[in-house]
């Protein structure tokens, strides 16, 4: 059997009950985006998007009268966070008791001294910053000195920006690996991220060369699938999020269009197991930059691709569409928002049904394990029987 998961990165479905504790009460990525920049999403509507509680419907965006052919629900995140690693780890059965470490004042000297020793250079910035602003403000000094630009955010990340004409990509990746070695124990951030950029001021981020260097997660459903002899194909930043653990094939992508194209290729190639894709543009290009129009266009791009993805499904295949957190482009600041995750599913012959409000993202992993015949006794309640 072939099961394909596509994560629409940051497409939140409304504030979680505890959102106020994260400063996000009232956030709603989907509703606010579509209100400011309406685009038609007819195919997502047919999967049940408009049936979800708190999703606003309208003839111009998500029509209320769409003939629903999929299964639909929304998911609570029980782990205390609103970042990529927390959400994706929980999808595959890892529920965190404590949030990943964050550094709102930058990284301490004992970290940065070791990092400087590893690179043989100094560093710039070392404080929370927007990715677009940090290269605008420090890019010229970086080109003069060759020092890497180190910055963080409200997420648990150590980000290293460098101009591609100043620092070769492989050198940047080596610096990230060195930082990953340093950032353990009390300094263990979830991800070290390579952020190359190019061009002239105000500079352009080279998103296709971004790489994430994650902490290694505990055992996940991905490991269970691999142990069961199944194909486990990670597309986009998915393999990086799990430190490459549990995959039989890893495929990097340039953008959402490339991610969709490579997902279709693997679906048509007869993968026996899981195809797991992250489409990051909504988050990286438009959510953090607070660009509702760009965000809406990315949603519409995916909606237009849905018929091709459905057509590529094998007769017994299943397509699941998820989101890992919110990133409301109309919200204050530039960081993620604590929201419900989307849950939409389609299979040939599957009738429309309400999967309700799932108590944890881990229900996804439990469902994947049961559907593909892998042994999993970790967190999560499978909804596989509700789909058959």
UniProtKB/Swiss-Prot annotation:
Highest rank taxon of the organism: Bacteria
Subcellular localization: Cytoplasm
InterPro entries the record matches: Alkaline_phosphatase_core_sf (IPR017850), DeoB (IPR010045), Metalloenzyme (IPR006124), Phosphopentomutase_DeoB_cap_sf (IPR024052)
UniProt KW Isomerase keyword: yes
Cofactor note: Binds 2 manganese ions.
Major subcellular location class: cytoplasm
Reactions accelerated catalytically: 2-deoxy-alpha-D-ribose 1-phosphate = 2-deoxy-D-ribose 5-phosphate; alpha-D-ribose 1-phosphate = D-ribose 5-phosphate
E.C. number(s) listed in UniProt: 5.4.2.7
GO (cellular component) term, any one: cytosol
One example of a Gene Ontology biological process annotation: 2-deoxyribose 1-phosphate catabolic process
Pathway where this protein functions: Carbohydrate degradation; 2-deoxy-D-ribose 1-phosphate degradation; D-glyceraldehyde 3-phosphate and acetaldehyde from 2-deoxy-alpha-D-ribose 1-phosphate: step 1/2
Enzyme class label: isomerase
Cofactor(s) the protein needs: Mn(2+)
Residue sites binding Mn(2+) 2 per the record: 283, 288, 336
Binding site residues for Mn(2+) 1: 9, 324-325
Annotated Pfam families: Metalloenzyme
Example of a GO MF term: magnesium ion binding
SUPFAM superfamilies listed in its UniProt record: Alkaline phosphatase-like, DeoB insert domain-like
Family assignment from sequence similarity: Belongs to the phosphopentomutase family.
Protein role: Isomerase that catalyzes the conversion of deoxy-ribose 1-phosphate (dRib-1-P) and ribose 1-phosphate (Rib-1-P) to deoxy-ribose 5-phosphate (dRib-5-P) and ribose 5-phosphate (Rib-5-P), respectively.
Protein name: Phosphopentomutase
Lineage: Bacteria, Thermotogati, Deinococcota, Deinococci, Deinococcales
